Amino acid sequence: MIDRYKHQQLRIGLVSPQQISAWATKKIPNGEIVGEVTKPYTFHYKTNKPEKDGLFCERIFGPIKSGICACGNYRVIGDEKEDSKFCEQCGVEFIDSRIRRYQMGYIKLTCPVTHVWYLKRLPSYIANLLDKPLKELEGLVYCDFSFARPITKKPTFLRLRGSFEYEIQSWKYSLPLFFTTQGFDIFRNREISTGAGAIREQLADLDLRIIIENSLVEWKQLGEEGPTGNEWEDRKIVRRKDFLVRRMELAKHFIRTNIEPEWMILCLLPVLPPELRPIIQIEGGKLMSSDINELYRRVIYRNNTLTDLLTTSRSTPGELVMCQEKLVQEAVDTLLDNGIRGQPMRDGHNKVYKSFSDVIEGKEGRFRETLLGKRVDYSGRSVIVVGPSLSLHRCGLPREIAIELFQTFVIRGLIRQHLASNIGVAKSQIREKKPVVWEILQEVMQGHPVLLNRAPTLHRLGIQSFQPILVEGRTICLHPLVCKGFNADFDGDQMAVHVPLSLEAQAEARLLMFSHMNLLSPAIGDPISVPTQDMLIGLYVLTSGTRRGICANRYNPCNRKNSQNERIYETNYKYMKEPFFCNSYDAIGAYRQKRINLDSPLWLRWQLDQRVIASREVPIEVHYESFGNYHEIYAHYLIVRSVKKETFFIYIRTTVGHISFYREIEEAIQGFSQACSYDT
């Protein structure tokens, strides 16, 4: 079991056979060492008790019922007066049955077996370290090829004959022609290695530091050569350089973590605790078993068959032994990752077996569903919706969720302010939803951040802190700019809300996890709080007013109306028809009074800034007044000038949407400038 005070993290990696043996073996009081599972049986069909040395053996994994052995005898657990702490007849200790949740066993494999995760998963770690093609290694593991194993200090057949100096070669049709059956078996056992044992020998001979040095030298040589002019050769060199970098990183990782490469070849196969692969009796007396039990049984059956072939019958043909070794390798592959080599193994009902990989990976796997996704106190969950009026560091919490999360704080506030005499009265006031409850809840929430999390939490921005505010409804309101960090959108996504309780957690939430303090991606440094999806659509709608100016062309398809007979107004009429505003506040006020639409063109008086006028642009029309003043009308602006050609006013042709967008950007820039001035 994992002690939460001693172990702050959980890491999955390779372990040595000695470590597996230390985990799985135990010494019972009579001095006997148990832990090896040798029989493929589970429960006896008559007594319904676990078989000895089987997959549910009580000697190996502990008693099914606390303090009761396989014989039915009972002892008080932890009673020092009891002389015997185990049953001498069946060998079962009188201990707590919870040991069956973490006590492991092991299967001693007759032949080494390659761990399929490190062979078949991409990138293949074994292929990277050995610098061999994956297909050749697969042929070697599954006994399709062989590996020449010369013995030092002795002249061998493979050394004397130059035609057999290849490291990996097919011998099925060449070497047997020179030997009798018995002579070839002796020669093969001495000279040829195949299966996972051949891979293990090569991995054991590796020096990781020499691999790093040689890979670095080759990488530098490839970098000095430069482009060859042949595109295919250049791509080949780039792929080789990338491979060398991955190989060096892998070797450094093995050195840093004190892992030996040969540990990727299994000699001892761990057996999971029985409670993690249970057999359950349902209605009608039928039994339901975990698929892993059937896969373990298959491994034990084939391993015992191989043991019998090697021990009981010395005249067994080598081909039969190699075939059985291949079956053991395939059985272990199916146990670890069913279907990784092609068609998955199925049961009698054509249902695919769930292997160990299927149990732990995915949304319904052991980690995400049981360990990461389990329910905790002071947490809630709801659908997220957009809250465009919220600040970047705020989120909207529904009243129903907020009162449950902060109920203890509200109770304390009611009692401190003498509004409730005890906890029971305070809870009754909360159930009745009195107005004073919401006032105290508002006070509590002002100084207490909350954490929002969206699964899967793939990086640190998957959980951020926010300042909560009360909102109506039953959904969590979120600012759309923070969605990219969560990889969320508003099509029904759900998020979990957590309340940090300790002062350390609250300080971390305020200083490190607030959303407005995580504007850059921690991986590449690019801005992560950028408009996406709904915000881009909103900005498009906001600024999608007419950009064609005041000129109308009956042959321009953009100007065509739904009715072909509708009259296209003249330039003068459009100019006089569109309203004029002195400032943006008047224009927005007219929009709120529904006198104009969001995309209706209008004329807005602008500051006397000549930069908006193109130097070569000429007016479309010029209108003169009786006093000598005149209006120069352009496509997107007009200028009011005096008789002396002095500029009185400049009006730009825009829409309410453009005005709103400009004001938001202006306020953001001013706020940023003020913040920078405060910092300096």
Curated annotation (Swiss-Prot):
Keywords, sorted A to Z: Chloroplast, DNA-directed RNA polymerase, Magnesium, Metal-binding, Nucleotidyltransferase, Plastid, Transcription, Transferase, Zinc
Family: Belongs to the RNA polymerase beta' chain family. RpoC1 subfamily.
Function according to Swiss-Prot or TrEMBL: DNA-dependent RNA polymerase catalyzes the transcription of DNA into RNA using the four ribonucleoside triphosphates as substrates.
EC number: 2.7.7.6
Annotated GO CC locations: chloroplast; DNA-directed RNA polymerase complex; mitochondrion
Binding note for cofactor: Binds 1 Mg(2+) ion per subunit. Binds 1 Zn(2+) ion per subunit.
Subunit structure and binding partners: In plastids the minimal PEP RNA polymerase catalytic core is composed of four subunits: alpha, beta, beta', and beta''. When a (nuclear-encoded) sigma factor is associated with the core the holoenzyme is formed, which can initiate transcription.
Chief localization: plastid
Localization per Swiss-Prot or TrEMBL: Plastid, Chloroplast
PANTHER family: DNA-DIRECTED RNA POLYMERASE, DNA-DIRECTED RNA POLYMERASE SUBUNIT BETA
Binding site for Mg(2+): 489, 491, 493
Protein name: DNA-directed RNA polymerase subunit beta'
Reaction(s) the record says it catalyses: RNA(n) + a ribonucleoside 5'-triphosphate = RNA(n+1) + diphosphate
First-tier enzyme category under EC: transferase
A Pfam family per the record: RNA_pol_Rpb1_2
Residues that coordinate or bind Zn(2+): 69, 71, 87, 90
Organism: Arabis hirsuta
Alphabetized GO MF terms: DNA binding; DNA-directed RNA polymerase activity; magnesium ion binding; zinc ion binding
GO terms classed as biological process: DNA-templated transcription
Cofactor: Mg(2+); Zn(2+)
